[in-house]
Amino acid sequence: RYLFKFYSDETIKKLNENIFQMDEQIARALILHQLLGTRISDTLTLKTDCLSIRENRYFIRIEQVKSITFEKAISDEIAQLIIKSIDYTEEHYGKTKYIFVKKEDPLRPFQYSMLQHRVMQMIRKNDIRDENGELLNFGTHTFRHCYGKKLTEMHIDDWMIARLLGHKTLQSVHHYRKIGNKIMADETRAVREKIDMILMDVVKEWD
């Protein structure tokens, strides 16, 4: 039976303190990945036109690889971090399809293997260890599990969690038909703000 793995809050804090010292665009990708709770492939293939504004709220369009496309509301702070990432890419590479692009080939997005390699290098260099004293084994999917765990701890309904995580299930589809983006923005605002606060204070250092 597969067991979900979670990082403790202390481990996440320690890991992020060092992530912020990495290449700034790689750091932005990893922070956004945590804040959005998306699959890493969804984060790395975010497009430069993924943001929209409706009723004074930011929404992000997430196009899951070989799957569904969906939108969810995000905080102004996350939107500004995305805009900053887009501006960085445009300044260095001109107009591109993706927000996070390879330096040697801006037509293509970041690759997960590159991201994991760079983070593991950083973990070994800084000797980052888990609660058992073992060298931290990094996997971006663990961030996603932590995001989902935070939602369940806040007693959010399963269908709302599925929506926020971009899961495609019959139960989720049933509820998607009943709920509009405006209601989604209102009902999840407190949840998203609590999750956002884990990282946004440190992100301000990039301003």
Language model features: what each stretch is:
Residues 32-33, 60, 79-86, 119, ...:
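Short, structured motif recognition centered on aromatic/hydrophobic residues
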Residues 43-44, 148, 155-167:
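Active-site-proximal segment of tyrosine recombinases
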Residues 54, 63-109, 118, 122, ...:
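Basic, alpha-helical nucleic-acid-contacting "clamp/cap" segments
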Residues 63-68, 165-193:
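Catalytic-site neighborhood detector that most strongly recognizes the C-terminal catalytic loop/helix
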